[in-house]
Swiss-Prot record:
This is Adenylate kinase. It comes from Vibrio vulnificus (strain CMCP6). InterPro entries: Adenyl_kin_sub, Adenylat/UMP-CMP_kin, Adenylat_kinase_CS, Adenylate_kinase_lid-dom, P-loop_NTPase. Its EC number is 2.7.4.3. Monomer. Residues 30-59 are annotated as: NMP.
Length: 214
């Protein structure tokens, strides 16, 4: 079962990725993790990537696709894998296709921008412990204070409204066209496209996914 997850930052992809991995016993392939592992291992692609990163450049699609090809050839991917955060652009999706990587399911989590902003902007964090709260969905016992230590909670830079809206802008310009791309692929019978309402309760979304993949 080879799966690609699509959805804006804050749409709940990470939570559902965890569910899919555990339920179906397939690994999640994160391009960031792959890059770090290849650089640490000193592989040929890792050396190329390190040189590019050290020069302050973006790693090319060619290197990323090469890393994916190596990763999915490993034994733990025999039953399938989950791609999260890749492809982000049409050329990357074309690259996967040209490599002969068949995708069984493309899963999109649909959440309106304003809902995502509310979700992210309402987050509060206790940085020393990593504990997180939400002013609406998971509030601390005392407003603005960590439940365990009583220390102040903060809004991480990543969760500030202007940062969230900027990231959403990048998503809509770069990644949203993939929705149309994979819609066409599904119409041609090359993959199955599944769309879920990401505003539902986490357990309900998981149940909907399980039913659709059965």
């Amino acid at each position: 079962m080879r799966i690609i997850l699509l959805g804006a930052p804050g749409a709940g992809k990470g939570t559902q990725a965890q569910f899919i991995m555990e339920k179906y016993g397939i690994p999640q392939i994160s391009t960031g993790d792959m890059l770090r592992a290849a650089i640490k291992a000193g592989t040929e692609l890792g050396k190329q990537a390190k040189a590019v990163i050290d020069a302050g450049q973006l790693v090319s699609d060619e290197i990323i696709l090469g890393l994916i090809k190596e990763r999915i050839a490993q034994e733990d991917c025999a039953k399938g894998f989950l791609l999260d955060g890749f492809p982000r652009t049409i050329p990357q999706a074309d690259g996967l296709k040209e490599m002969g990587v068949a995708v069984d399911y493309v899963i999109e989590f649909d959440v309106a921008d304003d809902v995502i902003v509310e979700r992210m902007a309402g987050r509060r964090a206790h940085l020393p412990s990593g504990r997180t709260y939400h002013v609406v969905y998971n509030p601390p016992k005392v407003e603005g204070k960590d439940d365990v230590t009583g220390e102040d909670l903060v809004v991480r830079d990543d969760d500030k409204e202007e940062t969230v809206r900027a990231r959403l802008g990048v998503y809509h310009s770069q990644t949203a066209p993939l929705i149309e791309y994979y819609g066409k692929e599904a119409a041609e019978g090359n993959t199955k496209y599944l769309k879920f309402d990401g505003t539902k309760q986490v357990a309900q979304v998981s149940a909907d996914i399980e039913k659709a993949l059965a």
